Design a protein with these regions (language model features):
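C-terminal motif of bacterial Sec signal peptides marking the signal peptidase cleavage site
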Residues: 11-14
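Sec-dependent N-terminal signal peptides
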Residues: 6-8
């Protein structure tokens, strides 16, 4: 009987749904003068593309220059530039071109999912903190 209970529990755990995370990719385009972001959530792209506020994309995917002391990267200002929506990709062109052999990073804030109370209880999400991923690239 105990084996059947363990088998049933194993079956239940094995069938739990794991939400798919968006795989964001960055690519240098236009002779390394612009960055193309692909793999963003289509619902978020649709909502933001209807908004007319010019700095809204910088709130979702800001681009930063990596400081020499990487402990200071949370205090960097985002690079100013132009964000354009092209098909399902977002293209960022900075006001000043990327410097050769300089390291940059993109901070992608993950707004999708995780709005459940159980996610807070399990420690997957903290109140007042938006989870993010830093994507590092070099020109």
């Amino acid at each position: 009987m105990k084996k059947l209970v363990w088998l049933f529990l194993l079956f239940c755990v094995g069938c739990t749904h794991q939400p798919k995370q968006a795989a964001v990719h960055i690519t240098l385009i236009n002779n390394s003068q612009s960055i193309e972001f692909t793999g963003l959530d289509h619902a978020i792209i649709g909502e933001i593309s209807r908004d007319s506020v010019p700095g809204i994309w910088q709130g979702l995917i800001p681009v930063y220059q990596m400081p020499a002391d990487t402990d200071m990267k949370n205090y960097q200002k985002p690079l100013p530039g132009v964000y354009q929506l092209k098909d399902s990709a977002v293209i960022f062109t900075p006001d000043t071109p990327f410097v050769k052999n300089q390291t940059y990073f993109v901070r992608y804030f993950k707004f999708e999912g995780g709005n459940d109370t159980w996610d807070i209880i399990k420690g997957k999400k903290k109140l007042g903190k938006t989870p993010y991923i830093d994507l590092i690239f070099k020109q």
